[in-house]
Amino acid sequence: MIFSGLFDRHPKLKIACTEFDAGWLGVIVQQVDYQYGPKKAAHGNTVREDMKLELPPSEYFHRNLWFTFLDDRAAALTTPIFGEDNYMWSSDYPHAACTWPYSQQIVERTCQGIDPAVKRKLCRENVNKLYNLGLEFNCA
């Protein structure tokens, strides 16, 4: 989607990528700009005309793509690299792989040591923002 130019043509489009966890994002986002730019330049390669983007590839991850995770501590620990604005914890209820009835325990284990403000974003504020739910939270 990124290299097709979709997000250049539709900059406000937001896509939620669900049900495959997100601990891998830190590595991908870190590498995608390098693979697209400096590495190609170092080897004398240029970007194909049909793959030229208006922004660095990583910017589309932050602007257009949102990711969910269930029981994925690596995803929570990746927030310093990827950022905390496009991650969302998910229970996957009612599917067989869901975290219910242990969702609260899994969230606590997954987010152990994470700043409480980041945890709030991962567990409720980001989904509220993505879907424009307009919910107000009066709890810590």
Set out the residue ranges of the language-model regions.
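Aromatic- and acid-rich polysaccharide-binding/catalytic face
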Residues: 60, 64
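Mid-to-C-terminal alpha-helical segments outside catalytic/metal-binding sites
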Residues: 4-5, 13, 23-24, 66, ...
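Histidine/acidic residue-rich metal-binding segments in metalloenzymes
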Residues: 1-59, 73-85
